[in-house]
C-alpha cells in the first residue's frame, strides 16, 4: 500500500483470504510514502478515471476526499509528515484535494464534478482534525472558486449534519454556495427537516439501500426503514445482498 507517509493505521482492514476465497480482517500494513512525482501521477489517475466514467455514460463524478482514504490521509496532520508541497501547512495538506478537483473539473466539466469530505470523521483510524473550522473553511472557500456542482459532507457520528445551528456546518454553508449534499443517519423525516431549514440542498443515503430494496417507496409512504446486518457487508453470495424483504402495506 501507499500513502502520504509511512504511518500504519491501528487496527485491521478487509482483505481477501487467498486460502478460503473469502474476505477477512487483516492487520493494516505500513504504507510506502508516495514520492512527489507519484503524487502528480495520482492526480492523473483521478482525471483518467473521471474521463472513463463520463465515456461510459455516467452523468457526473464525485471525488472521494473523505473517510480515511488517500486524500483524507493527506489532509490529516497525524498521518502526513511530508516535507514537500503536500505536507506541513494546512494549505499544503489540502493541496491534493484541490488539485484533483480542479483537474477533474477541467477534464469533464465543473458542472459534472462533486467532492466528498468528512469533517470530524474517525473512520478507518482517522483522528478528528485539530483545527476543523480552519481546515474545512479553507477547503469550502477554495472549492467554491472551482465552481463544482456540489460539495458532499458525510457525518459518521450522524449528529452535526442534523443541527442547522452547528458552527462548522454554518461556516461551510456560508463559504460554499453551490449545492450542498448531507449524509449520515438520515430518515425521510430528518431529510425533509434538513431541506426545510436550508442546511442542505441534497440528502445522500447509503447503508439503508442495502437493507431496503424498496427504500424509495418506504420514504414516500413514511414506512420505517429496516435495519441492516453489517456482518454480511463484505461476504460473497446472496446473504445480506438479495434476501432483505420489501415491506407489506
Where are these regions (language model features)?
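Flavin-dependent oxidoreductase catalytic cores
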Residues: 1-249
